[in-house]
A protein has these predicted regions:
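N-terminal glycine-rich anion-binding loop in soluble enzyme alpha/beta folds
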Residues: 1-59, 125-139
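Periplasmic-binding protein-like
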Residues: 6, 74-84
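General beta-strand structural signal in soluble alpha/beta enzymes
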Residues: 38-40, 81-82, 101-104
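Glycine-rich, highly charged phosphate/nucleotide-binding loops
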Residues: 53-71
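Short, flexible loop segments at the rims of nucleotide/cofactor-binding pockets, characterized by
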Residues: 56-61, 78-80, 98-100
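Short, well-ordered alpha-helical microsegments
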Residues: 87-91, 108-109, 129-130
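Short, acidic/small-residue loops that bind anionic groups at enzyme active sites
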Residues: 94-115
Length: 139
C-alpha cells in the first residue's frame, strides 16, 4: 500500500525535513512492512505559521492541498493523509478524487466519541482556530 502524506505548508528547505522527520518517527512504529508513506510539501501556500491568519494565503494553501490530493491519485497512491488536525482540503478534495482521504482531526474526534460522551481538544493559540475546530467537530 502507498500512502501520500501531504503537509499543510509551502515546502521550506530545512523546516520540511524537521517536520516530516518528527511525523515519520510516529508512524514508522506502526507501519506495516508492505506499506510505503511518501511525504509531500506544497508548491504554493502557507510560508510560515503566521500566514495562517491571512485569508489570501490560506486560500492558496487550500487549493494547493487539493491539487496535491489530485496528484496523489494520478500517481497511483492508495490513500492520502493531510498532515494537520484542521483536516485542510479533505472535504473539498473528496469531491474530485476517488482514493480515501484521511484527516487526523475527524479521525481523532470519531475515536474520542467511542471512548466517552465528553472530550476536549487542545489547539494552538492562533486567531480563528477555535471557531474552525468547533465547526469541524459539529460537522
Amino acid at each position: 500500500m502507498r500512502i501520500c502524506l501531504v503537509g499543510v505548508g509551502q515546502s521550506v528547505p530545512g523546516f520540511e525535513d524537521i517536520w516530516f522527520g518528527i511525523i515519520e518517527k510516529g508512524y514508522k512504529k506502526v507501519l506495516r512492512p508492505d506499506t510505503e508513506v511518501v511525504q509531500r510539501g506544497l508548491k504554493v501556500g502557507l510560508g510560515n505559521p503566521l500566514d495562517y491568519t491571512n485569508n489570501y494565503y490560506t486560500h492558496l494553501n487550500l487549493g494547493s492541498i487539493v491539487e496535491a490530493f489530485i496528484e496523489a491519485e494520478k500517481e497511483g497512491f492508495d490513500a492520502a493523509v493531510v498532515g494537520c488536525f484542521d483536516d485542510w482540503g479533505i472535504k473539498e478534495a473528496s469531491a474530485v478524487v476517488d482514493i480515501p482521504l484521511i484527516g487526523p482531526g475527524l479521525s481523532s474526534v470519531l475515536f474520542a466519541c467511542q471512548l466517552g460522551r465528553k472530550f476536549a481538544v487542545i489547539v494552538a493559540n492562533m486567531p480563528g482556530i477555535v471557531p474552525h475546530i468547533e465547526e469541524q467537530i459539529r460537522a
